[in-house]
Each structure stands twice: as C-alpha cells, then as structure tokens.
Amino acid sequence: KNMTPNKIKVSSLNINEKIISKSAIKVIKKLDQSGYKAFLVGGCIRDLILDIRPKDFDVATDAQPQQIKRLFRNSKLIGRRFRLVHIRYGNEIIEVATFRSSSNSSKKILRDQDGRLIRDNEYGTIEEDVLRRDFRCNAIYYDVLKKRIFDFVGSVQDIRSKKLVLIGNDIDRIREDPVRMIRAVRFSTKLGFSLSDTLRKAIFDNSNLLRNVPSARIFDEFIKLFMNGFAEKVYLQMIEFGLLKEIFPNLEKELNNN
C-alpha cells in the first residue's frame, strides 16, 4: 500500500514541547546521527495534543534491536518475540521498538501462548508499523528534529474530535487480538473518547473471544484499566459490553443476585 502521511507542523497543534522527555530526544538524536530514522510514537503524542502530561515516551525506529543495543551502553533487550530495547536514564526508561509489519502473506495463522494471532512478525517500514497498531489515535509519529507530526490515518482529526477508531475492519482487528476490546474501554474512559456504533457492536458481539486469552494477559490489561482512576465508568462499560462476565463469570451472577 502506498501511504503518504499528512505532515503537520507541531507549531499548529499547540503542543507544549517543554514537557517532552529530554532523554527521549537524546535517544532520537543519537539514532538520527547514526543514520537511522526515529520518531516519538503513540500515546505520548496523543497526550501532548490533548494537553495531558505523558507518563512514558516511546520511540519507533528503523534500527534493529541489536543495532540500537550497540549504540547505547545503558540499554537492554527485552521481550522474547519482539525484542524491544529499554534505555535507562536515571530512573526514566525510554522504550525503543523497531518498525514491524504484520505480514499477511503467511497463510499459517497461529496463536501464540498469549492468545494473539501471530503471523511471522518481521521488521517492517513505518507504513507497515502504522497498520499493525490498534487505534488511529495511537498510530501517530512525531519527528522531533524537524518538528513535524506524521499522520497516516487521520490520527490528529480523531484526537481533536475525541473518537476512538480501530485501524482497518473492527471485527478482524478484534479477532486478531481480543484484548483490544479491553483497551477500547480503557482509552474511551481514560480519554473521554467515543466509540463508533460499529465498534460498540463488534465488541458486544465478540466479547466471548476473551475466553481464549490467557489470564496473565487479561490481568495485565486489567491493572492498566483500573489504574486510570475511572473505576466506576470502566466497570459500567465492561458490563454494558458483556466483557465482565467473560472474564469473571461468577462475579456477574453474584452482582445480579445482590
């Protein structure tokens, strides 16, 4: 697919650049000087546009994990399947990931131990990296050095209109990784973003897919979900979408009895 990003000057978005992590900028500069492309990516940019102070700053690059590791002696490789690199500055950790493709070329579609569909996850281009991300508001890249946002899928528009939209077909993307349903609840409650009717229906109709997901992954998402500080909203939305009864079959019975 030929995808041309909309390049948006940061100055037009009223972003407070002072709150961008100096360490993340250091990492990007060093990658750039070594001949690689590197961007701030994802939730940190979404939050900057919303004028929320980001908790973490993640970097995406075309450098591969071993190449990144060689450049930063304060770094270590993390993760079995996707090797991420964590670079430590004092008590701050910058997570650096290589652009990945989710190649649909391989017909053997398997589930890994974590219940996600896996294809051969190879490294890819920035365009491929965009398409494997879940929500459009998170598929956004910031070129810190040129002060431009690369927007491939209408991310800025979604963030401004507070909409949570999956990239691609709702049902396909949920089947590919059912945990996206929990993430949809997390982002919509945390950010006050609305879900389209088709996405609401897709979640409602596919809530039973959470049964295939190992409890360790659900637990991880659950912690993030309830750490938001919007527990009541989250709880009501989880019931509305039929997600709670899939995760805690007995809990909902109890609650109905009381």
Where are these regions (language model features)?
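Catalytic cores of the polymerase beta-like nucleotidyltransferase superfamily
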Residues: 1-258
